[in-house]
Amino acid sequence: MPSISTNIILAFITALLGMLIFRSHLMSSLLCLEGMMLSMFILSTLTILNLHFTASFMMPILLLVFAACEAAVGLALLVTVSNTYGLDYIQNLNLLQC
């Protein structure tokens, strides 16, 4: 179990570093966010099953619901920005540039 947890934590850190490095494009940021949410889901599921937390069996499901909502809003924003500006740069999302 510790090696699985270590690998999942490393996957989360890798996605976080990818978010910090590739922050200019919206699509790259969304992919890194999805990787972070997936690693958080797997880690929370393994922790709950391993430690027998019967009161918190719904937490991974709620995490998946929020991840799906985040993905839907992110893709809608990506389509809107791509249709408006023709690019998917995050700098186009600044409201002060109007």
Swiss-Prot record:
It is found in: Mitochondrion inner membrane. It holds the Pfam family Oxidored_q2. Keywords: Electron transport, Membrane, Mitochondrion, Mitochondrion inner membrane, NAD, Respiratory chain, Translocase, Transmembrane, Transmembrane helix, Transport, Ubiquinone. The chain crosses the membrane at residues 2-22, 29-49, 61-81. Its EC number is 7.1.1.2. InterPro entries: NADH_UbQ_OxRdtase_chain4L/K, NUOK/Mnh_C1-like. GO terms for biological process: ATP synthesis coupled electron transport. It is an enzyme of class 7 (translocase). One of its GO terms (cellular component) is respiratory chain complex I. It catalyses: a ubiquinone + NADH + 5 H(+)(in) = a ubiquinol + NAD(+) + 4 H(+)(out). It is a multi-pass membrane protein. GO terms for molecular function: NADH dehydrogenase (ubiquinone) activity. Core subunit of the mitochondrial membrane respiratory chain NADH dehydrogenase (Complex I) which catalyzes electron transfer from NADH through the respiratory chain, using ubiquinone as an electron acceptor. Part of the enzyme membrane arm which is embedded in the lipid bilayer and involved in proton translocation. Belongs to the complex I subunit 4L family. Core subunit of respiratory chain NADH dehydrogenase (Complex I) which is composed of 45 different subunits. This is NADH-ubiquinone oxidoreductase chain 4L.
